[in-house]
Amino acid sequence: MSFMVTFMVEADPIGKGRPKFVRRGGFITTYTPTKTRDYESIIKDAAKQAMGSSEPVETPVTVAIYITVPIPASYSKKRTEACLSGSERPTKKPDIDNIAKCFLDAMNEIVYMDDTQVLTLHVTKVYGTIGMVEVMVKEDFD
């Protein structure tokens, strides 16, 4: 039986933030930034809804992530048209790898058991009128 799940997060993409360190008493503890934690929660909710009652897969998977970043409001009409036509590409933050990491981590124990199962990863970042991320996960066949 083959496995495939797709879902969409209709929110501006956010890259995974670096862990923060704080001294409490004589100990140093780490925590995930609130912005990252909140965004991962949105991803988890979308993934859970897409999975329904299905259990996480334990086989190797291929993941495709299609990132649409919103065109800045400050761009001129001409520049906006260039963004929508694809002649101007989104080379600014958030970084594509940090967005992917946020999604891969959030899908742990929901879509697959662990992101070490991801053998193939396709990530694309483009401009669009609204920010969103589309994800497809399927079994990886040789």
Regions found by a protein language model. Give the residues of each.
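Acidic, proline/glycine-enriched N-terminal capping motif
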Residues: 1-142
